[in-house]
Amino acid sequence: IIGDTINGAITTADNIVGRIGII
């Protein structure tokens, strides 16, 4: 999920999920 933060730039939804993963 943390990796989704970087890939989240492509998908807004994944970006939000990625940030939650970091937190």
Swiss-Prot record:
Its main location: secreted. It comes from the Eukaryota. Belongs to the Frog skin active peptide (FSAP) family. Septenin subfamily. This is Septenin 2c. It comes from Osteopilus septentrionalis (Cuban treefrog). It is found in: Secreted. Keywords: Secreted. Expressed in skin granular glands. GO terms for cellular component: extracellular region. May act as an antimicrobial peptide.
